[in-house]
Swiss-Prot record:
It comes from the Eukaryota. InterPro entries: Ku70, Ku70/Ku80_beta-barrel_dom, Ku70_bridge/pillars_dom_sf, KU70_core_dom, Ku_C, Ku_N, SPOC-like_C_dom_sf, vWFA_dom_sf. One of its GO terms (molecular function) is DNA helicase activity. This is ATP-dependent DNA helicase II subunit 1.
Length: 592
């Protein structure tokens, strides 16, 4: 469903008050990411064969399943992402030059999702055959890769009405043919290198899915030469050995997991200079990336109204009213003031800008104050905002990567964190931050930036009851030991990993919407899948306790015995009445 923007809204979106706001808009416009992902699948005879690594499932079906799952996930977390699928070496009647457009490159929508979902359902129910619906072209005369990539490039660059321009573009390239015929021809290889080079010029990147197996390993040497040789190396980054994508082959069983890992594109939260020593003019440039975002079910909706047989989107419009008369006040008559009691202070825009620029000549900046032991300055209860992942940016200050790499190694070795002061956006107030290096166990190498509170932002916690006598008792020590043993039984020391748990509220919300839109029939006689991994974990714990109670093995029986012991201690301690409040002296009643 598409909606037209009314004229008054278009004028409001394009209108700016002054040149400063216009330049500021241009400056931050590059952070408005619009991602595009194209599945580019090469048909080969082996794509239609059952793969033992997939439990006998056909490889091509696994790829289409991954496409279907990807769109279902993007609707939840990244609904503005555009997804398309192009299959080449295909003799479908609608194919152009053996390139079949299964779904066009559009923002995730109901029509494309239903197209893929219905196709998979028809194949699963044996209504159609995969070979008939997506037939392979003559294997003896396969199409070259160059025309396919040119078509994908044109698709990425083509403006689409109602959609923003794509800023992050990826090609998910699937093949199990490691020696295409065109690679043996010098002219074809040269032509393909130029096409790949052209794609990199337009910032279109590859994510390779080179499918191999033990019986037929995939030799990636030819593709590595094409994809990495054709890519360019920036002169300022000449120390990099390669600027191309990874061409490591994967097993077919890893297709879905790799699609899920690489679907999300890095979100730049801020970009600013980091002043290590302002007097010595030692400044580097950094990028901060968003680590997590909060998704709320039912929050992504639009207000529409019926205009005849067409639904149009309704937009909100703000008006300021006179407090006494209720008449609308023109925006040109409004001004910002600060009040202190009965006093009113009015500042002009220039005076406000002067106050904001008093901290630094940079609109956003980070300034190093000093270093401190990580154990002393990094506490979980001091983190008052979502942290950012910080890496060097070589564009503004040359040598930023080498400088921060050296700083990273030193801080990691000495177990230090940096205290920094600054602001991440032009209009935000300055704050205090802790910049700490990622641990050796962390897959990502870089820094985490945590915002910490000032004295005025700290609130008093409630007083705790005094249980010193209880804590020092022998019963409490035994209970602590029993609790520690129980935790070891259930392997809870690994802690909470978000990648193991979906949000059940989100999954339920979008599951209902998906079934409604795709007209999926639900068998109400079957028990509904809860879709909540936390409840599944609880059920596993219950099952383990039950098996321990029924087991004849002495070691297995220890679990239920520890639980009984823990419950007896807990019941005994909870029944103890700790009188912490002094009793009030009641007035004596007179019996008159």
């Amino acid at each position: 469903m598409s909606f037209e923007q009314p004229d008054f809204l278009k004028s409001q979106l394009t209108q700016t008050r002054d040149d400063d706001k216009e330049s500021d808009h241009k400056k931050w416009r590059r952070y408005e990411a619009h991602d595009g992902i194209v599945f580019c699948i090469q048909l080969t005879p082996t794509m239609y064969l059952s793969n033992p690594d997939l439990g006998g499932k056909i490889q091509l079906l696994e790829i289409l399943d991954s496409l279907n799952d990807l769109m279902s996930q993007l609707v939840v977390v990244m609904p503005s992402t555009a997804v398309g699928c192009y299959i080449y070496n295909c003799s479908h009647p609608n194919a152009e030059d053996n390139v079949y457009e299964l779904i066009p490159l559009r923002d995730v929508n109901y029509k494309n999702m239903k197209r893929v979902s219905d196709l998979l359902e028809d194949i699963e129910q044996d209504r159609i055959l995969l070979k008939d619906e997506i037939p392979i072209a003559d294997p003896n005369n396969p199409i070259e890769l160059s025309p396919v990539l040119i078509k994908v490039r044109e698709t990425f660059l083509q403006p689409i009405e109602g959609q923003k321009q794509l800023t992050n573009k990826k090609i998910f390239f699937f093949t199990d043919d490691d020696k295409p015929a065109e690679f043996l021809n010098v002219d074809s290889r040269s032509r393909l290198r130029k096409v790949v080079d052209d794609l990199y010029d337009y910032y279109i990147n590859f994510v390779t899915f080179f499918i191999g197996s033990e019986d037929k390993p995939f030799d990636d040497s030819m593709y590595a030469d094409i994809l990495k040789w054709g890519s360019k190396i920036n002169e300022a980054q000449s120390w990099l050995s390669s600027h191309g994508p990874s061409t490591n082959p994967i097993n077919a069983s890893y297709i879905k997991s790799k699609v899920k890992r690489t679907k999300e594109i890095k979100r730049i939260k801020f970009r600013c200079p980091l002043m290590l020593d302002e007097r010595a003019d030692l400044v580097v440039s950094v990028n901060g990336y968003t680590i997590v975002s909060h998704e709320i079910p039912g929050s992504k909706y639009k207000l529409v109204y019926a205009n005849g047989s067409v639904r149009r989107e309704a937009y909100s419009h703000r008006e300021y009213l006179d407090a006494e008369t209720g008449e609308a006040v023109d925006n040109s008559q409004l001004s910002k003031v600060y009040t202190f009691g009965d006093e009113i202070i009015e500042l002009t825009e220039d005076e406000n800008l002067k106050i904001q620029s008093g901290y630094s000549e940079h609109e956003s900046f980070l300034k190093l104050i000093g270093f401190r032991s990580t154990e002393q300055c990094l506490h979980y209860y001091d983190n008052i905002d979502v942290p950012a992942f910080v890496v060097p940016n070589e564009e503004d200050y040359a040598g930023s990567i080498k400088t921060l790499a050296s700083l990273y190694r030193t801080m990691l070795f000495k177990k230090k964190s940096a205290m920094v002061w600054g602001k991440l956006r032009p209009n935000s107030p300055p704050s205090m931050f802790v910049l700490t290096p990622s641990s050796k166990k962390d897959y990502n190498q870089g820094f985490y930036l945590y915002k910490v509170p000032f004295m005025e932002e700290v609130r008093k916690l409630p007083d705790f009851l005094n249980h010193s006598a209880l804590i020092e008792s022998d019963d409490y020590k035994v209970m602590s030991k029993v609790t520690e043993t129980l935790i070891n039984f259930f392997n809870l020391k690994n802690g909470y990993r978000p990648s193991d748990f979906h949000n059940p509220a989100l999954q339920k919300h979008f599951k209902i919407l998906r079934e409604y839109l795709l007209q999926i029939e639900v068998d109400k006689s079957k028990p509904e899948d809860e879709g909540d991994e936390t409840l599944q974990k609880v059920k596993q714990i219950y099952a383990r306790i039950a098996s321990s109670a029924k087991s004849d093995d002495v070691k297995q029986q220890r679990l239920v015995k520890y639980l009984k012991l823990w419950n007896s201690f807990y019941n005994r301690l909870s029944n103890l009445e700790v009188d912490t409040k002094p009793t009030k002296n009641k007035k004596a009643k007179l019996n008159l």
